[in-house]
C-alpha cells in the first residue's frame, strides 16, 4: 500500500474511475441485450410496434456507446464493432426489399 499522499489519492481516483467505467460498460451490455431481444421478437412476429421498439432501444444503445467513447471508457474501434453488430442484427431481421 502506498504511503505518499499523492499516490493514495491516485489509488482513490483509480477506484472511482473503475467503478464508473464498470457502470458504463454494464449499461451498454444491458442495452445491447435488450436490442437483440427486440430484434428476435420482431423476427418471429414482424409488426410496426415491435419495429418502433427496436428503433428506440437501438438509439439508446448507440447513444450510450457514443457517450462511452467520449468519456474514454471504451475505444472508438470497440464502439464501432458494437454498433456494427447491432446494425447487422437489425438488417438480418428486416425483410429484403
Curated annotation (Swiss-Prot):
The source's superkingdom equals: Bacteria
* Record-level Gene Ontology MF annotations: small ribosomal subunit rRNA binding; structural constituent of ribosome
GO cellular component terms, semicolon-separated: cytosol; small ribosomal subunit
A Pfam family per the record:
Ribosomal_S20p
Claim: Aminoacyl-tRNA synthetase is one of the keywords in the record: no
Keywords carried by this UniProt record: Ribonucleoprotein, Ribosomal protein, RNA-binding, rRNA-binding
Q: Which SUPFAM superfamilies match?
A: Ribosomal protein S20
Known InterPro entries for this protein?
A: Ribosomal_bS20 (IPR002583), Ribosomal_bS20_sf (IPR036510)
Share an example GO biological-process annotation for this protein.
translation
Q: HAMAP family annotated for this entry? A: Ribosomal_bS20
Describe the function of this protein. Answer: Binds directly to 16S ribosomal RNA.
Q: Which PANTHER family match?
A: 30S RIBOSOMAL PROTEIN S20 (PTHR33398), SMALL RIBOSOMAL SUBUNIT PROTEIN BS20C (PTHR33398:SF1)
Family, as annotated = Belongs to the bacterial ribosomal protein bS20 family.
Name the record gives this protein: Small ribosomal subunit protein bS20
Amino acid at each position: 500500500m502506498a504511503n505518499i499522499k499523492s499516490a493514495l489519492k491516485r489509488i482513490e481516483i483509480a477506484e472511482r474511475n473503475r467503478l464508473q467505467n464498470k457502470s458504463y460498460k454494464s449499461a451498454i451490455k444491458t442495452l445491447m441485450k435488450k436490442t437483440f431481444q427486440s430484434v428476435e421478437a420482431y423476427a418471429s412476429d414482424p409488426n410496426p410496434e415491435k419495429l418502433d421498439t427496436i428503433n428506440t432501444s437501438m438509439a439508446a444503445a448507440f447513444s450510450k456507446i457514443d457517450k462511452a467513447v467520449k468519456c474514454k471508457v471504451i475505444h472508438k474501434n470497440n464502439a464501432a464493432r458494437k454498433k456494427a453488430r447491432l446494425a447487422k442484427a437489425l438488417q438480418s431481421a428486416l425483410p429484403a426489399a
